[in-house]
UniProtKB/Swiss-Prot annotation:
Binding site for Mg(2+): 45, 66
Cofactor field: Mg(2+)
Gene that produces this protein: engB
Species of the source: Pseudomonas fluorescens (strain SBW25)
Function: Necessary for normal cell division and for the maintenance of normal septation.
UniProt protein name: Probable GTP-binding protein EngB
Claim: Methyltransferase is one of the keywords in the record: no
Source organism superkingdom: Bacteria
Keywords: Cell cycle, Cell division, GTP-binding, Magnesium, Metal-binding, Nucleotide-binding, Septation
Residues given in the record as GTP binding sites: 38-45, 64-68, 82-85, 149-152, 182-185
GO annotation (BP), single: division septum assembly
One Pfam family of this chain: MMR_HSR1
GO molecular function: GTP binding; metal ion binding
Family: Belongs to the TRAFAC class TrmE-Era-EngA-EngB-Septin-like GTPase superfamily. EngB GTPase family.
Length: 213
């Protein structure tokens, strides 16, 4: 028999809840939310779809298509949130400013937000957007877990070296509280570590693992 992460079943039964263009359109601010953030084309939607075993988040050949706060229901008390992608050059500046304003309002005022998953493309980590998110997480005391996405694009040795380099840089600049891992959506690499982070933030880790046949 094999131990099963308690968050896995909830992720597999997740459903689309609603999209919000601004904070007052979000669900009631109660329960547990974990938000997924990342620069455009960092693989955010693909990672979210892989974790939920579904096609919940819209993927596109054109980065920056996620323009709303998209909420996905795990159960009556728990939600995942797909945040707008940032940084794509073809997105008009007024739209970028609109996204930034409402993202800041969501991140700064959402009581139910328990943690932030930040996606970084392993080939281009620590962008200006990533640094801003790291600064915000530390300043606000928000738990953060980083997925170095597209790890399959590098050899394992190169991916591991990048992980160690970014991990060292984060520890020097932002302390030891932020965790980081390798992740690949197509190869399904790193799922268990990501599920463990989600389970802890959603207060499922102490409920005991379910036994899978």
């Amino acid at each position: 028999m094999q131990l099963k992460n308690p968050i896995l079943g909830l992720c597999q039964q997740s459903t689309f809840m609603l999209s919000a263009a601004k904070v007052d359109q979000c669900p009631d601010d109660e329960g547990f939310e974990v938000a997924f953030a990342g620069r455009s084309n960092a693989g955010k939607s693909s990672a979210l779809n892989t974790l939920t075993h579904a096609s919940l988040a819209r993927t596109s050949k054109t980065p920056g298509r996620t323009q709303l706060l998209n909420f996905f229901k795990l159960d009556d008390d728990r939600r995942l949130v797909d945040l707008p992608g940032y940084g794509y050059a073809k997105v008009p500046i007024p739209l970028k400013l609109h996204w930034q304003r409402h993202l800041e309002a969501y991140l700064g005022g959402r009581e139910s937000l328990k943690g932030l998953i930040l996606m970084m493309d392993i080939r281009h980590p620590m962008t200006d957007f990533d640094l801003l998110m790291l600064d915000w997480a530390v300043a606000s005391g928000m738990p953060m877990h980083i997925l170095l996405t597209k790890a399959d694009k590098l050899t394992y040795g190169a991916a591991k070296n990048t992980l160690l380099k970014v991990q060292s840089e984060i520890r020097k600049g932002w302390g030891d509280a932020i965790t980081i891992q390798l992740f690949s959506a197509p190869k399904r690499m790193g799922l268990e570590d990501a599920y463990t982070a989600l389970a802890g933030w959603m207060e499922l880790a102490d409920k005991g693992a379910e036994i899978a046949e």
